Amino acid sequence: MLLVLLSVVLLALSSAQSTDNDVNYEDFTFTIPDVEDSSQRPDQGPQRPPPEGLLPRPPGDSGNQDDGPQQRPPKPGGHHRHPPPPPFQNQQRPPRRGHRQLSLPRFPSVSLQEASSFFQRDRPARHPQEQPLW
């Protein structure tokens, strides 16, 4: 059991160490926007989903142009279809309360020798002639 655990840890450490040079920790940082997000451009208001059943229109669009079929709220009775969720600009999530920035923890680098010596400390060293022959 200990051998399996040691193998898994060593494999994880070796793969993490080999990819550590390519990893940029800022890639794993994401932001949960808040209702009044200061990163938005000043000409934009807070991004909120449009009322159900209505399509958002870009500013300056008079609405007289034919943009294809319009979505309408479902009529009472019959099949109840839910409209697809509205697209958000820049694929952001809807605004939420608070502005938090979450990131993955940064662990120190550990060499394979350090990991194996950590597991070898707990049991006494065996000499080759003391090992059972099975």
From Swiss-Prot:
Tissues and organs where the protein is expressed, per its UniProt entry: Abundantly expressed in lacrimal gland where it is found in the acinar cells but not in the intralobular ducts. Also found in the submandibular gland, the parotid and sublingual glands.
Biased composition (Pro residues): 47-59
Stretches for region Disordered: 28-134
UniProt KW Hydrolase keyword: no
UniProt feature, compositional bias: Basic and acidic residues: 120-134
Compartments, as annotated in UniProt: Secreted
Composition bias, Polar residues: 110-119
Pfam family, one: Pro-rich
Leader peptide range in chain numbering: 1-16
Cellular component GO terms, alphabetical: extracellular space
GO biological process: visual perception
Key words of the record: Secreted, Signal
Name this polypeptide is given: Proline-rich protein 4
Organism: Homo sapiens (Human)
Lineage: Eukaryota, Metazoa, Chordata, Craniata, Vertebrata
